[in-house]
Each structure stands twice: as structure tokens, then as C-alpha cells.
Amino acid sequence: MTLIHMNILMAFSMSLVGLLMYRSHLMSALLCLEGMMLSLFVLATLTILSSHFTLANMMPIILLVFAACEAAIGLALLVMVSNTYGTDYVQNLNLLQC
């Protein structure tokens, strides 16, 4: 495993630790999820380029599409929670049920 792969895996694990530590605020959780998705994108791109696996060239693009959808839904949820309750606590998400 090269140094670049180890750095990317460390970035992913630090984002995961940040998600576990700062899970009370929705904005912090969304930022950690974005860090995880970006490190997965870079890792997938490097793996595909180094292995010359041409059939999986679209996988990083699909991963970015899912990351953009996750970010849009997360930001919409953040706006709804902050407009309704004035804070971005994750515990307020249980109160949004019908």
C-alpha cells in the first residue's frame, strides 16, 4: 500500500471519527459525511487508474452523483430543522415526524 493510499484511508477514518464525535449537530455530521465521500472518490479513482480497470471508469462519477444528492437532501433537512426549531441539533429530527 502506497503512502497516498494510506493518507486517503487516514482522511476517511478521521472523517468517520469526526462523525462519531460530533454527531449532535447536523452541520458537523454533514461535513464529516462529505469528507468521507470525497476520500472515497479519490480512493476509487486512484484504484481504478492504477489497476487499469477500464470497465469501472464511471464508478467515481456515480459516487460523486450520490454525494451531491446526499448533500442536497442534507442541506434541505438542515434548513427545515433550523427554520422550525432555530438550532441544528440532530435530536430535533425525531420531532419532524408526522
Curated annotation (Swiss-Prot):
Protein's UniProt name: NADH-ubiquinone oxidoreductase chain 4L
Chain segments annotated as transmembrane: 1-21, 29-49, 61-81
Entry annotated with the keyword Nucleotide-binding: no
Family according to the record: Belongs to the complex I subunit 4L family.
Gene Ontology cellular component terms for the protein in this record: mitochondrial inner membrane; respiratory chain complex I
One GO term of the biological process aspect: ATP synthesis coupled electron transport
Keyword Acyltransferase annotated: no
Classification lineage: Eukaryota, Metazoa, Chordata, Craniata, Vertebrata
The protein's role, per its UniProt record: Core subunit of the mitochondrial membrane respiratory chain NADH dehydrogenase (Complex I) which catalyzes electron transfer from NADH through the respiratory chain, using ubiquinone as an electron acceptor. Part of the enzyme membrane arm which is embedded in the lipid bilayer and involved in proton translocation.
Enzyme class: translocase
Primary subcellular site in the record, as a coarse category: mitochondrion
Subcellular location: Mitochondrion inner membrane
Keywords on record: Electron transport, Membrane, Mitochondrion, Mitochondrion inner membrane, NAD, Respiratory chain, Translocase, Transmembrane, Transmembrane helix, Transport, Ubiquinone
InterPro entries per UniProt: NADH_UbQ_OxRdtase_chain4L/K, NUOK/Mnh_C1-like
Reactions catalysed according to its record: a ubiquinone + NADH + 5 H(+)(in) = a ubiquinol + NAD(+) + 4 H(+)(out)
Origin species: Megaptera novaeangliae
